[in-house]
């Protein structure tokens, strides 16, 4: 398990897990989330989540960015 950390995320995709970790992700704001072994492209299909908590487990390689209508979002990961 990783230490609890907080991040501000914008429109650029950021990797949260690499497919080997189980994490708890709290999202504040509206986020696009996808599973990809490499950095997704601009038009990548994604699930939209708002103000929620996700349990992410292997083999999911989680990427996240703020939704198109949102400025920045805040996530807390542990």
Predicted regions and their residues:
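Surface-exposed loop/edge segments in extracytoplasmic proteins
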Residues: 2-3, 39-47
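Beta-sandwich interaction modules
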Residues: 14-15, 47-59
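Noncatalytic modules at the cell exterior or secretory-pathway interfaces
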Residues: 20-25, 56-72
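Short, surface-exposed beta-strand/strand-loop-strand elements in extracellular ectodomains
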Residues: 26-43, 77
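Low-complexity intrinsically disordered segments
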Residues: 4-5, 74-78
């Amino acid at each position: 398990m990783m230490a609890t950390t907080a991040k501000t995320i914008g429109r650029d995709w950021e990797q949260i897990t690499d497919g080997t970790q189980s994490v708890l992700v709290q999202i504040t704001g509206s986020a696009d989330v996808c599973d990809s072994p490499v950095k997704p492209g601009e038009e990548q299909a994604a699930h939209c989540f708002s103000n929620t908590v996700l349990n992410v487990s292997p083999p999911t390689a989680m990427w996240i960015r703020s939704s198109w209508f949102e400025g920045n979002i805040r996530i807390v990961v542990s």
